[in-house]
Amino acid sequence: MSYSGAGLGKPGSGKRRIRDLLTQSDNRVCADCGAPDPKWASANIGVFICLKCCGVHRSLGSHISKVLSVTLDEWSDEEVDSMIEIGGNASANSIYEAFIPEGSSKPGPDASHDQRMRFIRSKYEHQEFLKPSLRITSVRGSSTKTPAFLSSSLSKKIVDSFRTNSSSQQPQLEGMVEFIGLLKVTIKKGTNMAIRDMMSSDPYVVLTLGQQKAQSTVVKSNLNPVWNEELMLSVPHNYGSVKLQVFDYDTFSADDIMGEAEIDIQPLITSAMAFGDPEMFGDMQIGKWLKSHDNALIEDSIINIADGKVKQEVQIKLQNVESGELELEMEWLPLEQ
């Protein structure tokens, strides 16, 4: 039976152009706090941001800031073109930070989560630092402003997308999700994967949490693929299990399923929250996800503090398929850190 990796598209390119833009001097630090070496971007705003500010941007909702990883996510051509046309952090900040009131200041790299939240919401959601004539209010009469500005230097595509957001913002705000942290999943390797082509398969992994999807690269013609690839998911307050699926990439037809599994992330998050700041502790075991008849674990999955980070090694037997095992590592990144 064939399944398609719906909504993901084939693993693509575009990252090189984004990385080239990232090398500009103004883009080598976070647009919001100045932290060095940002690895995230707001595709609709046009700025590069650090991991800590990325968490705040995600909590605002994608209708305000659509966050993508420079290295981990697939970028559409339109998203890449928009980032390049805006020109980077200096250009965007010349609009969004045009009128910072006297006595107010940007947060620094070591600022608290609350300081970042206040500044970033003021900057993008409420547009408090824009020239008043550039602010756009909702056509529904809502007092909440869209994170948009009108500038001849910006592409018509971006402005049009802001106008669309303005007309439909209220129902989106009602469904806005607040996130509590980020889940970094390292897809390590697969073993004895199912054959879906003549003699082999071209496997890739898809992770789904709520409405989010993250996808690995394709490993060509390999039943024992090695990825060692990091994927990132935002975790909301009311989170469920992560759905893992493996597909066989096919150029001319729908990608075939190569197995799936449900990953319970509650033990990891509960253990991490119980201990608080992991940097306060030495290396130690703090939890365990137990193997049982109703999960896909090959063996008990241990949760450890290692080098100041909360990590969990997971080995799963893929379900609803004739063969295949997958090894991965999960790491919990709370937004408050």
From Swiss-Prot:
GO terms for biological process: intracellular protein transport. Residues 164-281 form the C2 domain. Disulfide bonds: none annotated. Its cofactor is Ca(2+). GO terms for molecular function: GTPase activator activity; phospholipid binding; zinc ion binding. Its main location: Golgi. InterPro entries: ARF_GAP_AGD11/12/13, ARFGAP/RecO, ArfGAP_dom, ArfGAP_dom_sf, C2_dom, C2_domain_sf. It comes from the Eukaryota. Expressed in roots, leaves, flowers and siliques. Low levels of expression in seeds and stems. GTPase-activating protein (GAP) for ADP ribosylation factor (ARF). Binds phosphatidylinositol 3-monophosohate (PI-3-P) and anionic phospholipids. This is ADP-ribosylation factor GTPase-activating protein AGD12. The gene is AGD12.
